[in-house]
Amino acid sequence: MLGGECTGKTSLAQALSVDFKIGYIPEVLRDFVDQCQRSPRVEEQDAILLAQCDAIGEALSELDPGATGPILICDPSPWMTAIYSLQYFGDQAMFAKAQALMLALANAHQFNWFHLHCADDIVWRADGLQRDGPSHRANSLALIEQYPPLRGIAGHDRVEFLQGGLDERRRISQCRLDDLAKCPECLGAPVINAEIIAMHSWRRKQTAKPDKSPIDSCTRIC
């Protein structure tokens, strides 16, 4: 899942998790803010990115190796950590780190990334510590468009831009995912690279379970 604050990512991700009967990976950043009662600092961005990817890797390791189609919903994609790092700290280095981790996961577990990008055309609502305002949300959208995830990497660079209410976004997402399920080769071959809402991870086969717990990682950040 891609999108700035208050763009309906979580509502859509949870709905699609039910629709497709697949796992849902929540946002490490939100857990961090809830536990630490503050926004992360620049030096904590790496740990948040790693914890988000660890959660995805652990969920992938629990799946049936023969599973196909949409297999996991990530709310949000690890790419959003890189977007926020640039937006709030002026740090572009996180893009390379996010790409390396995302492709390592894709290579290890043999799946393709597919992203759903939620527009900012819904009413902005404050929720306490984490949200900064409509202008910040608009900045996030602009940065996602300027720095799309995994650009130019065959099979992993598909992004669907979603506008409208939840029902409309849900309908379009269902249709798009159904189309891809009928034509998985449309995503291209898996990347062979040692260097991963995405909202959706596209499954080919499964490998080993990672060692680190994302909950432990988040606790250590605080």
Annotate each predicted stretch with a short phrase.
Residues M1:
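Hydrophobic anchor at the beta1->P-loop junction of P-loop NTPases
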